[in-house]
Amino acid sequence: MKNATSLIIYCFLMFLLMNNVKGQGKKKPPCPLGLSANGKCGHDGPKLCFSEMERKFNKDVVKTITHCKCWDDRRNNVDKHRCTCYLKHGFPCTNG
């Protein structure tokens, strides 16, 4: 009886373990979305980029932003910054 109980518990734990691992399929990489604007990133560049994305894109796109990065860029003696925000899924990526 003790062996039968141990076997049932072992099978149940293996079932839980296998289902947990199976559910972890390939995670899709975040989808980058970028833009350029005048001025420098400043001390809080990611927030600046997020605000610019809010102005440029609709709420459905903005809701899927996970994080943003900002890089200063100087061209033709004009300060600019480049923003890249990463989306969980959806527009402009079509990976579902």
Curated annotation (Swiss-Prot):
GO terms for biological process, alphabetical: defense response to fungus; killing of cells of another organism; signal transduction
Pfam families per the UniProt record, alphabetical: SCRL (PF06876)
Entry keyword set: Antimicrobial, Disulfide bond, Fungicide, Plant defense, Secreted, Signal
Cellular compartments per GO CC: extracellular region
Disulfide bonds: 31-93, 41-70, 49-83, 68-85
Secretion signal, residue range per the UniProt entry: 1-23
Localization, UniProt: Secreted
InterPro entries noted in UniProt: SCRL (IPR010682)
Family: Belongs to the DEFL family.
Protein name: Putative defensin-like protein 236
Organism: Arabidopsis thaliana (Mouse-ear cress)
